[in-house]
Amino acid sequence: MIDLPFLLAEEIEGGLFDFNGTLPLMALQFLTLMVLLNTIFYKPVTKVLDERDEYIRTTLTTASSMLVKADELAAKYEEDLSEARRNAQLKIASSQKEAQNIVSEDIKKAQLNAEKLIAEASKQLNVQKEEALKTLENQVDTLSDQIKVKLLSSQS
């Protein structure tokens, strides 16, 4: 029998690399492995990574455009809201002013009515006063005549 490890031990001269027929075979195996890994593994992984990168980029672009649109809409709604508030305040102010005008007109009418009633009552009181004075004058005249008659009759 041939002792193979012994034969191999004699052939190996030592050193890091042996430049013999196995070196080109190892290089060919390495290059074949690189081509296979590139074809089977690296290209699909690179493709998936590129697709993912493109998806992220388009999603970010879409999200940023949506954010810009949302900001524009928010600004527009804020502007519309402030305009609506301003219009509401103007309507409230005009309604209050109109209500104050109506109330002041009603107060003026009521004052005029009250003044008319007071003037009418004053006239009626003056008329009644005059009538009472005339009645009193007549009664005074009658009483003075009666007193004269009594005085004259008691003197005679």
From Swiss-Prot:
Keywords: ATP synthesis, ATP-binding, CF(0), Chloroplast, Hydrogen ion transport, Ion transport, Membrane, Nucleotide-binding, Plastid, Thylakoid, Transmembrane, Transmembrane helix, Transport. It comes from the Eukaryota. The keyword Ubl conjugation does not apply. GO terms for molecular function: ATP binding; proton-transporting ATP synthase activity, rotational mechanism; proton-transporting ATPase activity, rotational mechanism. Pfam families: ATP-synt_B. It is a single-pass membrane protein. The chain crosses the membrane at residues 20-42. It is found in: Plastid, Chloroplast thylakoid membrane. The keyword ATP-binding applies. InterPro entries: ATP_synth_b (IPR034679), ATP_synth_b/b'su_bac/chlpt (IPR002146), ATP_synthase_B_chain (IPR050059). GO terms for cellular component: chloroplast thylakoid membrane; proton-transporting ATP synthase complex. In plastids the F-type ATPase is also known as CF(1)CF(0). NCBIfam families: PRK07353.1 (NF005607). F-type ATPases have 2 components, F(1) - the catalytic core - and F(0) - the membrane proton channel. F(1) has five subunits: alpha(3), beta(3), gamma(1), delta(1), epsilon(1). F(0) has four main subunits: a(1), b(1), b'(1) and c(10-14). The alpha and beta chains form an alternating ring which encloses part of the gamma chain. F(1) is attached to F(0) by a central stalk formed by the gamma and epsilon chains, while a peripheral stalk is formed by the delta, b and b' chains. Belongs to the ATPase B chain family. F(1)F(0) ATP synthase produces ATP from ADP in the presence of a proton or sodium gradient. F-type ATPases consist of two structural domains, F(1) containing the extramembraneous catalytic core and F(0) containing the membrane proton channel, linked together by a central stalk and a peripheral stalk. During catalysis, ATP synthesis in the catalytic domain of F(1) is coupled via a rotary mechanism of the central stalk subunits to proton translocation. Component of the F(0) channel, it forms part of the peripheral stalk, linking F(1) to F(0). The b'-subunit is a diverged and duplicated form of b found in plants and photosynthetic bacteria. This is ATP synthase subunit b', chloroplastic. It comes from Pyropia yezoensis. The gene is atpF2.
